Regions:
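Glycine-rich adenosyl-nucleotide cofactor-binding module
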Residues: 151-165, 170-171
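Active-site anion/phosphate-binding pocket segments in diverse small-molecule metabolic enzymes
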Residues: 179
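Terminal amphipathic alpha-helical/low-complexity segments used for targeting or macromolecular assembly
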Residues: 1-154
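Hydrophobic face of beta-strands forming the core of extended beta-sheets/solenoids
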Residues: 163, 169, 175, 183, ...
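Extended hydrophobic/aromatic segments used for targeting, binding, or gating
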Residues: 205-210
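Conserved small/polar residues in nucleotide/adenosyl-binding loops
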Residues: 226-227
Length: 227
């Protein structure tokens, strides 16, 4: 029994070391590509999807912009136009991409149902909704409010997640399941926060000014909590 426990501990320690080793963006991207190639080999019926979303791209940001733009495509703003907006944001504010990378590592570390780095990237709507918000937030600070609101609206329709473009959200965020999450205009969510579905960071009722909650670093908010 002791040898079994020690072996499991060694495997867990190795996984923790692996997370530390992929701190650089390139390492994370290469790890994701290896995972997705293995997925494509194992499930050939999805090979086209895996190639379109990950394997056909040279960089993490290229893949992310393609994936999100494909999800947000509409009859009034094409996926091509949305992708150009995202690439503009990534170029002007590299911290947007860095935050996405940190989010993936946080989800992989905290969510026991997540067994790879590519899983949240490809399949978790909480991760995807948050990355669109990061672009909308950048647009908001460029005074491009209409476009920021459009992205917010699309996220609400597609993912059932409603985050005001002005809301300040840190890195290492996990929106687990994410359905029904609402985050208001003056809310602040610091680094390493986890929240489950149905969480509302709502207003106090004031007509203007600072009126939404401030969630400090490392907090866990359980499902259906309204603050």
């Amino acid at each position: 029994m002791h040898s079994s426990i020690n072996k499991r501990y060694a495997l867990e320690l190795a996984e923790e070391n692996k997370i530390a080793e992929i701190a650089e963006a390139g390492s994370l991207w290469q790890a994701m590509r290896r995972e997705v190639q293995a997925r494509a080999d194992f499930e050939p019926i999805m090979a086209t999807f895996f190639h379109a979303t990950v394997l056909n791209h040279d960089t993490f940001e290229d893949a992310l912009s393609y994936l999100l733009a494909s999800e947000l495509d509409s009859s009034v703003v094409s996926s091509m136009a949305i992708r150009e907006i995202m690439q503009e944001a990534y170029q002007a504010e590299p911290a947007v991409i860095r935050a996405a990378e940190i989010d993936i590592k946080a989800i992989r570390a905290r969510d026991p149902a997540c067994n790879s780095y590519s899983t949240p990237f490809l399949f978790y709507k909480g991760f995807q909704a948050l990355q669109v918000h990061r672009v909308a937030h950048w647009l908001w600070h460029q005074e491009r409010h209409s476009l920021a609101f459009f992205l917010q609206s699309q996220v609400n329709v597609i993912y059932n997640v409603d985050i005001h473009p002005a809301a300040q959200i840190g890195c290492g965020i996990m929106l687990d399941h994410a359905t029904g999450v609402v985050i208001g205009e003056t809310a602040v969510v610091e680094d390493d926060v986890s929240m489950l579905h149905g969480v509302t960071l709502g207003g106090t009722g004031k007509e203007s000014g600072d009126r939404h909650p401030k969630v400090r670093q490392g907090v866990l908010i359980l499902s259906l909590i309204h603050i």
